[in-house]
Structure formats: C-alpha cells, structure tokens
Amino acid sequence: MIGEFLMKKVVLFFLLITALTGCGLNQNTNSNKTESNATSSATATGFSTSAAGNSQATTKQDGHLITAKQALSAGEYAKAIEEATASIKDNANNAEAYSVRGFATALNGDAAKGLTDTKKAYDLDPNNVANYYNMAMVYKLQGQLDESKQWFEKVLEKDPSNTWSVYGIATIYADQGEDTKALDWLEKAIKIDPSVKSVAAEQDHFERFHNNRRFKTLVGL
C-alpha cells in the first residue's frame, strides 16, 4: 500500500506531467517539470495518443474524454474514471479512454484494475507510446518495478531523451538499492532537463541519498 507521503508525490508528479500535455496520453515531458511517479504517459512522452490514426483504435476526442483528462489533471480520479467510462461506452475501441481510466484507477488506489485498462489500451493501439508511459507508472504503483522499468525502456526506444522515463528508471534503481545506477540515471535526466534537480531533492526515492556527496552535487543541495 502506498503511503500518504508517497501518494502525494505521485499525484504531484502526475499533475505536473499532465500539465505538459493535458492528460495521461498526449503529452510532452521534456519541457515540463514533473514529479516522478505519477506522470501520465501523454505528458511524459510527447507522442500523440495514437500512431495508428486510421485504425479502429483511433481516439475519439469526445466531451467525456476531454472532461476525463481535465479531472485527471485536477486529481479528481473518481470523476476521471466516470468520464472515461462514459467515453468507452460511446466508443468501445477508444484506446486513449482506456489508458486514462487505467491510470486514474491506479492513482485512485486500485493498480491491478488500472493495469487491466492500460493493457486493454495497448491491445487496441500497440503504437501509442503515451500508453507505454502509463503502463510503466501503473506497474510502478503496483510495486512491479522490473516490469515498470521495461515499459520506461520501451518509451526510451522511441524517445531516448524522454526526461521522465529516464528519471523513472533512476527512481526504480534507487528503490531497488542500486545506488550507482540510480545516480547514473539521475544524472542523465538532469542533463536533459535541469528541473529534475528540485524533484529529486524532494522525493522520498532519494531521501536516503541526502548525505551522498554525488547526489548533493547533482541536485545542488
């Protein structure tokens, strides 16, 4: 179970990411300051929600989906789930709506159920890189760190300079006790976007690093 402190950080990360692109799936990471564990895929990746524009999975930007994204950005997860569900009722092949609902569901406390939706989104549109990021985040919330890292790596295969996927891997290594790798990846993220410094300095992933000389140099403590 995620502690209150961690959840607040996760929520902050997601909200910051969402601010970049508007939701969990059509967003841009590298230019925005985001918290590291709750960033939505859309924001963090900067890829459009669907790379297969002519497929059945093509996202229908209906009012329910737009409202769901807005609710997700505001931290109103129950409303985001409700609106995304309404969007899915209108279009059962709406990959983006499944991804938004999955991420909102995970942030609302049911990561296992959220993972079902993000997997469904992947089945509908396997080319949606934004959903790769959401998958990584949902796995992370569920505590499946190796699986989470694999999905961050899938994002980086498409966008090697994706700040928050690089940072996400850094936090995973930190949580797994791989200190050198954690700092190596943190350094990579900071080189891409220096705003990562303030995020890392505040997040509990790196709390035990606050007396580490290299960490202090990297984040400016």
Language model regions located:
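Structural signature of tandem alpha-helical TPR/SEL1-like repeats
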Residues: 74-83, 107-120, 142-154, 177-185, ...
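Canonical tetratricopeptide repeat
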Residues: 100, 134, 168, 202-203
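Alpha-helical segment of the N-proximal tetratricopeptide repeat
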Residues: 57-96, 100-103, 107
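Terminal, low-structured helical/coil segments at or just beyond the last alpha-helical repeat
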Residues: 27-53, 191-221
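C-terminal motif of bacterial Sec signal peptides marking the signal peptidase cleavage site
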Residues: 20-22
